[in-house]
Amino acid sequence: MHALQAKILDPRLGSEFPLPAYATPGSAGLDLRALLKEDTLLEPGQTILIPTGLSIYIGDPGLAAVILPRSGLGHKHGIVLGNLVGLIDSDYQGELMVSCWNRGNTPFTIAVGERIAQLVLVPVVQAHFDIVEAFDESQRGAGGFGHSGSH
């Protein structure tokens, strides 16, 4: 398991609400909670930025973190991330914020302390461009959207 530096920015985290943790030994994501001042109503079509009360410092350029939606919120209530995926660079040290978007048709209340997203560490390979005049041939070539078949 990789050690991750973290700062608790909201004293309720770790006392009233548990610190992010893996739910099972096979879990990939750490649940992030809505550390709001009060329950917040998210109207259909509305997007709000929600604090998590936590900042992290990854420090290793070979790693990044992604903030992903929780499947149940999206499927059952239409609550997804406003930016679809949040990317946390290894040198970022600010508070983790979650952009929540209600893509559904009914208002949804986000309760203080509710699990709203998940944080997943991922490996990163940094690349540089090697400018060429032509690519080596491949089977696919420049075939794009729909190129490999309709189903």
Curated annotation (Swiss-Prot):
Protein name stated in the entry: Deoxyuridine 5'-triphosphate nucleotidohydrolase
Catalytic activity, EC: 3.6.1.23
Recorded catalytic activity of this chain's protein: dUTP + H2O = dUMP + diphosphate + H(+)
Organism (species): Pseudomonas putida (strain ATCC 700007 / DSM 6899 / JCM 31910 / BCRC 17059 / LMG 24140 / F1)
Record GO terms (molecular function): dUTP diphosphatase activity; magnesium ion binding
Family assignment from sequence similarity: Belongs to the dUTPase family.
NCBIfam families: dut (TIGR00576), PRK00601.1 (NF001862)
Gene Ontology biological-process entries: dUMP biosynthetic process; dUTP catabolic process
Alphabetical UniProt keywords: Hydrolase, Magnesium, Metal-binding, Nucleotide metabolism
